[in-house]
């Protein structure tokens, strides 16, 4: 029984000044023909009709807060500070910087790696005594034997 009854929903309504009929707020016009003007349009029309003074015009135009700009004082102290800041930034540019994004070609990187290998291929065991070489070889053999004897489950 309660399902057949229609629920009364209270809507936001406004009354038409000409016919005093209640109309939903979302409607822009009344069935009698009266057209409701929104506040935005009303304010826009008022501003077109009466141009505001120069002070009010500037305030009306400026809606967002603007960034506060500091005035630079022309002095030798400020110039010295700027020069110091610039000299620091130049010293950082001397270091090799990696480019951002995908590299264009890997050939340059390969050349660098080859140069590094050639420089690093100096035999560090050339000056090693025979006794030390024997100790190292025994240690390596022991490590290899332990690795081979392990049962690895793959």
UniProtKB/Swiss-Prot annotation:
Keyword annotations from UniProtKB, A to Z: Coiled coil, Phosphoprotein
Keyword Metal-binding: no
Coiled-coil regions, chain positions: 104-132
Residues passing through the membrane, by range: none
Modified residues (Phosphoserine): 91
Stretches for region Disordered: 43-119
Pfam family, one: UPF0547
Domain of life: Eukaryota
Skewed-composition ranges (Basic and acidic residues): 68-84, 109-119
Record InterPro entries: C16orf87-like, UPF0547
Family statement drawn from the similarity comment of this UniProt entry: Belongs to the UPF0547 family.
Protein name: UPF0547 protein C16orf87 homolog
Native species: Mus musculus
């Amino acid at each position: 029984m309660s399902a057949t009854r229609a629920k009364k929903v209270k809507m936001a309504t406004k009354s038409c000044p000409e016919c005093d009929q209640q109309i939903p707020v979302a409607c822009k016009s009344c069935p009698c023909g009266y057209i409701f003007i929104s506040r935005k349009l009303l304010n826009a029309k008022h501003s077109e009709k009466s141009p505001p003074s120069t002070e009010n015009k500037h305030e009306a135009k400026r809606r967002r807060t603007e960034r506060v700009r500091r005035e630079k004082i022309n002095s030798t102290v400020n110039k010295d500070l700027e020069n110091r800041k610039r000299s620091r930034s130049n010293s950082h540019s001397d270091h090799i910087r990696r480019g951002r994004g995908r590299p264009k070609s890997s050939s340059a990187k390969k050349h660098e790696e080859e140069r590094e290998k050639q420089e690093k291929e100096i035999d560090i065991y050339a000056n090693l005594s025979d006794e030390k070489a024997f100790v190292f070889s025994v240690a390596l053999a022991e490590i290899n034997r332990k690795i081979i004897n392990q049962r690895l489950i793959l």
